[in-house]
Amino acid sequence: WDQFMNSALGKQMTPHAVFEYVNTNSTNSATHQLCWFSDDPAKLEANQGIFASAKFMELFPVVNTYINNVTEISNYMGQSLIADPGDFNLRFSVLYGINVQDPVSYAGAFTKMKAAFDKRESTGTIELHEIIAGGEQGITHVVIVRAPSMAEWLSGRNEFIQTKAFQEFAAATRPYTDVIQTTSGRPLQFYNVQ
């Protein structure tokens, strides 16, 4: 994969990350995730054209390695609703796959809670992403909490879940939100990120 992403063709693709799952309660057996991101939907669509191109097929060793060593378990199209790509490089993350029955109310409560989260002294970020198509059964949104390390993530979590802002968020969203899965992990490699 590294060979492809460092080729002239790979450098034409949008930024993406290779993410390794560490702990998960998901029912699927995925161990890694490839995640492409861009603010420009046309550029994301162009990625598909690259994979379907004759030039990509000329990279037979890469294609053959992928075919022989990777089993695609799931794929989805999502959109970042509240996220800062500048924080994607933080080294430890927990992803909460959730089912939200009232997205408007959830977004309002999330925005209020995030404002309190961002005022903390700790390093880290919290994001909200929408699952538009594909993905795991019942998951409509993903909340990602990132920190520089697992130790910092746990310390920040233990502190923040006791705050009034988090308690109000949890109480407000509980009637229309179900957490379906949690997954921890870390980015292994970023490509085409400036």
Walk through the language-model features, giving the residues of each.
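Short S/T/G/P-rich N-terminal loop/turn motif that feeds into the first structured element of a domain
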Residues: 1-194
